[in-house]
Amino acid sequence: MTASNPLRDESQTRPGGQPLRGAHLDSTAQLMNAITSQLGSQLSLVSLDGTRRPVPPPLVLVGHGSRDPRALSTVRTLIERVRELRPHLSVHLGHIELNEPLLPDTLASLDPTGEAVLVPLLLSRGYHVKRDIPEAAAAVPGLRARVAAPLGPHPLLVETLYARLVEAGWRTRMSDAARRASGVVLAAAGSRDPEAAVDARRTAQLLAERLGVPVVPAYASTAAPTVPAALRAMAARGRHRVAVASYFTAPGRFATECAEAAPWISSAPLGTHPTMARLILHRYDQALATQATTEPALASA
C-alpha cells in the first residue's frame, strides 16, 4: 500500500488528484499582506534622506479591568484601532485589576532600560491615575516612563458622547419647546477624589454647550448625585425628555444599571468609536512632549 500524503488537502484538488492552482492563494495572500505590513512599518521609520528615525517608545494602554467579558473585548478592539492609525507604534495592554495582563506584568515584559508611555483608559483624575499607575511604573528599575493624562475632559470625548447620543435617538434638530423639555444626565462611575468630580463637571459643561440643553453629571457609585436622583431633579425642573449619556469606556455593570434608569433614551458606552483611538494617541503625543516622569500629566485639550 502507498502511504497517503498527510500534507495534501483533498478539498483543494481536481478529480484525479491534480492540485488546483488556487489551492494556496489564500495563505500566499496572507503571507504577502504580513510582509507588506511589516515592510511598511519599517519604512515609516526611515526618513527621506535614508537615515533611520528613532523608534518611538511603546504605548501602554492602562485599562481598569472588569468582570464583564464585553469590556475586555472592547479594549482589545480599541487597541487594534490605535495600531491601525499608527502601524509603527508598539502598543501594549495592562490592567489595574481583574483582567490579564496586569499592568506590572506588561511593564515587566518591556525593555527595562527603555522608555514607555502609559496612557490611562480612564476618564478623569482619581486614585488609579494618581497612585496606582505611577507606582506600577516606578516599580520597574531603569524604565523611563511617562504617565499621560486621563482621557477626560477633552473635546474629542464630547464628540464621542454626542455621536453615541445621536445613535440612541437624540434629535440634532428640535423645536424650542422640545429643547426646553430636554436634558441629559452624564452617567459616570464615581470617585471619592474631588478632582474626578471637577473633571466630570467640565465634561458635562462641554457637552451642554454642544447639545444646547442642560447636562448634569451623576454617578453609579461612591459620589453624589446618583443617576436616579439627577433624573428626579431634572423632572422637577420641567425636563421630561431626559437622556442618559453613558460616560463609561466599555460595557459593564455600572453602564447597564445607569442605562436601565433612563426614562427616555440611553447611549452606548464610548467603546471603540474611532474618536477614542485618536484621543489615546493624542494623550500619548502630549506625554512624549514632556520630560519623562511617572507623575501623571494634567488633562488638557
Language-model region placement:
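Active-site-proximal alpha-helix that buttresses catalytic centers in soluble enzyme cores
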Residues: 1-301
